[in-house]
């Protein structure tokens, strides 16, 4: 606690991220949070809440299973990562997630994009959305691009690029705290090294040539970030708000509908609808009047209104209903 306090005083630190947070105890983490919040109201505390083999009693571990007694402390959400991208262990590198093409995960995907805070029939993992760090990759395990090199090895580069874009947008429009690993915006690779902590710079360095080659995804990522900032609907602060305003369901073929019904006077809309289509086939739907596309697979908005909408293959389209 002394070190935490001094670092905030001397270096004006805004928050801390704890590696292997699960080896610590609930009491210590809560004390750190209280100390930090007294100094800065927006102090942020998060870490790896894995259930690690220590002598601590299970109920005292600062693990994700005890999130209910650690309010305002966030955890890397491996459920989100595995459902969206697919499991990351070497023995399951060929398994797919929802966005990488396995629509059997569609129902689990509903839990992931709603912050894992909605109960039965969905999987509730957290008490509040500020406890989940939504990510598709971190410094550990394979990058999402390397993961697709295994699980989507039958697909061409352009198809995998579209899936990469879908994973980035999913991270940024889901309820909870988005986490983008540096390099995912230009399809970063570690040359299939899934445990590169002791690998040389050749593996772990940022390959800036890829930033040129995949500049279109960088631009798309910028638009995704701007979208989240622009629309408060993707940044609901409490479980109560999510329960009140968000509706999710799975349509035919594993297509996911993510609706947020909320009055928005700034944009003169009363609902947002996100449609996820990770399949090879485009979809068409008939809506009630006054819907328009505000974000397509290029990050562009469409001017026209209509009742008939299209969602191309391998894309997420976002629509708004004019109030």
Model-derived regions, located:
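Short, glycine/charged-enriched secondary-structure capping and boundary segments
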Residues: 30-33, 59-62, 195-197, 288-290
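Flexible glycine/proline-enriched surface loops and loop-helix/loop-strand junctions
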Residues: 12, 128, 204-205
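The substrate-binding groove and active-site-proximal loops of carbohydrate-active enzymes
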Residues: 13-24, 148-159, 208-211
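Active-site-proximal structural scaffolding
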Residues: 9, 22-29, 128, 160, ...
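Non-transmembrane alpha-helical segments in soluble domains
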Residues: 4-8, 33, 133-136, 168-172, ...
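Carbohydrate-interacting/catalytic domains
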Residues: 158-161, 172-180, 184-186, 190-323
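Active-site neighborhood of glycoside hydrolase catalytic domains
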Residues: 1-56
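Conserved alpha/beta catalytic core and glycan-binding cleft of carbohydrate-active enzymes
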Residues: 33-38, 42-187, 191, 246, ...
């Amino acid at each position: 606690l002394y070190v935490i306090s001094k670092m905030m005083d001397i270096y004006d630190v805004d928050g801390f991220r704890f590696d292997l947070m699960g080896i610590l105890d609930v009491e210590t983490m809560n004390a750190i949070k209280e100390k930090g919040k007294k100094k800065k109201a927006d102090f942020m505390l998060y870490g790896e809440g894995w259930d690690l083999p220590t002598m601590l009693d299970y109920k005292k571990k600062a693990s994700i299973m005890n999130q209910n007694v650690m309010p305002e402390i966030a955890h890397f959400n491996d459920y989100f990562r595995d459902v969206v991208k697919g499991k990351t262990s070497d023995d399951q590198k060929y398994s797919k997630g929802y966005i990488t093409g396995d629509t059997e995960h569609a129902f689990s995907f509903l839990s992931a994009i709603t912050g894992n805070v909605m109960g039965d029939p969905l999987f509730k993992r957290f008490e509040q959305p500020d406890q989940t760090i939504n990510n598709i990759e971190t410094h550990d395990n394979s990058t999402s691009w390397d993961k697709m090199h295994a699980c989507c090895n039958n697909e061409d580069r352009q198809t995998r690029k579209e899936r990469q874009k879908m994973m980035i947008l999913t991270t940024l429009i889901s309820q909870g705290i988005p986490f983008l690993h540096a390099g995912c915006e230009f399809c970063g690779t570690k040359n299939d090294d899934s445990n590169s902590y002791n690998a040389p710079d050749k593996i772990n360095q940022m390959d800036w040539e890829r930033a040129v080659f995949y500049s279109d995804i960088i631009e798309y990522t910028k638009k995704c970030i701007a979208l989240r900032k622009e629309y408060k609907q993707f940044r609901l602060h409490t479980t109560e708000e999510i329960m009140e305003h968000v509706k999710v369901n799975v349509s035919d073929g594993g297509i996911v509908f993510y609706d947020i019904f909320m009055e928005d006077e700034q944009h003169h809309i009363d609902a947002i609808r996100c449609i996820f289509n990770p399949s090879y086939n485009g979809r068409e739907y008939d809506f009630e009047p006054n819907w328009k596309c505000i974000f397509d697979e290029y990050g562009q908005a469409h001017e026209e209104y209509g009742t008939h909408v299209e969602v191309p293959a391998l894309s997420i389209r976002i629509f708004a209903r004019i109030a």
